[in-house]
């Protein structure tokens, strides 16, 4: 293992424990952004005073080590950032060194990972010459695992006292983080996080797209709409392309046209156009659009899509062993 890097007061270490596809995307966005900041003589004043510049990624197998190194090493600039990719046997040492720990493992693996031998000491705030090290930040992107779930594991399974608990955050990015177009939802907490932590979290997840903060009781619905929603919209896009192919369009062109049309509609909504107004603007009297829309309404597309979001919300809550409210008996 390489020797730990010496950090300045403006440099943090971030460990991704269980660095799969999402972890790679997040680190890719951060590393690329750090390189851009280094090339800009006047970086934005909105950047937090301390940024993660040293990174440790842990994975389960040697082949995964090679995969992560292949994806991320080209983005590392020696004068700007450092990266080490280790096997998961190094989870404890990675956590000990890190200021920020991102849990990228499967939800069912969280307890076992955090309760590993030595993890209690790795996560405990150390006191040296009368000065306490800052609290670590644990960010979970594990579907269905709540902040209380994580805090319970840290207290009961890891054995940390209330005074030594890290700052625990739940965030839910989506697969579009790969192209920096994620919609990430971060769980608000009570009492609120310190401003410095909020600024840091926002900066991290804005490297891969947009960020919003919402209360914990909405997180499973956010998982459904933002994470599962990618698949829902892909199905609608595929269906639209199928219709075009049925009417004679080549498959490749139909896929491209459907994707670009969906992107255009999304862009208009993000610019402030209400979806209903957008739909109305395109629906000229006696035209083809209103004819097609009536077929969609007759087929119950609106209700089916809404119910899919509700059902996925229920399943998301079950992933972490929790419950979901306001689903009105959608499961049967």
Curated annotation (Swiss-Prot):
Pfam families: F420_oxidored, P5CR_dimer. Keywords: Amino-acid biosynthesis, NADP, Oxidoreductase, Proline biosynthesis. Its EC number is 1.5.1.2. SUPFAM superfamilies: 6-phosphogluconate dehydrogenase C-terminal domain-like, NAD(P)-binding Rossmann-fold domains. One of its GO terms (molecular function) is pyrroline-5-carboxylate reductase activity. InterPro entries: 6-PGluconate_DH-like_C_sf (IPR008927), NAD(P)-bd_dom_sf (IPR036291), P5C_Rdtase_cat_N (IPR028939), P5CR-like_CS (IPR053790), P5CR_dimer (IPR029036), Pyrroline-COOH_reductase (IPR000304). Pathway: Amino-acid biosynthesis; L-proline biosynthesis; L-proline from L-glutamate 5-semialdehyde: step 1/1. NCBIfam families: proC (TIGR00112). This is Pyrroline-5-carboxylate reductase. Belongs to the pyrroline-5-carboxylate reductase family. GO terms for biological process: L-proline biosynthetic process. It catalyses: L-proline + NADP(+) = (S)-1-pyrroline-5-carboxylate + NADPH + 2 H(+); L-proline + NAD(+) = (S)-1-pyrroline-5-carboxylate + NADH + 2 H(+).
């Amino acid at each position: 293992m390489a020797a730990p890097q010496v950090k300045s007061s403006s440099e943090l270490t971030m460990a991704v424990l269980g660095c799969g596809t999402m972890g790679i995307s997040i680190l890719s966005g951060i590393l690329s952004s750090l390189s851009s900041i280094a090339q800009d003589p006047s970086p934005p004043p909105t950047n937090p005073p301390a940024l993660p510049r040293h990174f440790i990624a842990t994975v389960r197998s040697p082949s995964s080590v090679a995969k992560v190194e292949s994806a991320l090493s080209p983005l590392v600039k020696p004068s700007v950032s450092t990266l080490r990719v280790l096997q998961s046997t190094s989870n404890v040492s990675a956590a000990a060194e890190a200021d920020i720990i991102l849990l990228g493992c499967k939800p069912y693996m969280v307890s076992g990972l955090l309760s590993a031998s030595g993890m209690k000491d790795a996560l405990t705030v150390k006191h040296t010459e009368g000065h306490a090290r800052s609290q670590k930040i644990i960010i979970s992107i594990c579907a269905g695992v709540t902040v209380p779930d994580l805090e319970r594991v840290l207290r009961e399974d890891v054995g940390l006292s209330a005074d030594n608990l890290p700052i625990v955050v739940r965030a839910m990015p989506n697969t579009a983080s790969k192209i920096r177009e994620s919609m990430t939802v971060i769980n608000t907490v009570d009492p609120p996080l310190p401003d410095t932590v909020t600024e840091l979290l926002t900066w991290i997840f804005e490297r891969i797209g947009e960020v919003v903060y919402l209360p914990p009781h909405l997180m499973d619905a956010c998982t459904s709409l933002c994470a599962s929603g990618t698949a829902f919209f892909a199905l609608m896009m595929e269906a639209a392309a199928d219709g075009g192919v049925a009417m004679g369009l080549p498959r490749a062109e139909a896929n491209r046209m459907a994707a670009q049309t969906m992107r255009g509609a999304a862009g208009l909504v993000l610019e402030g156009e209400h979806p209903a107004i957008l739909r109305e603007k395109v629906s000229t009297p006696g035209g083809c659009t209103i004819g097609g829309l009536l077929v969609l309404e007759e087929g119950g597309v609106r209700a089916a899509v809404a119910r899919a979001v509700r059902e996925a919300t229920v399943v998301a809550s079950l992933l972490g062993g929790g419950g979901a409210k306001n689903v009105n008996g959608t499961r049967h």
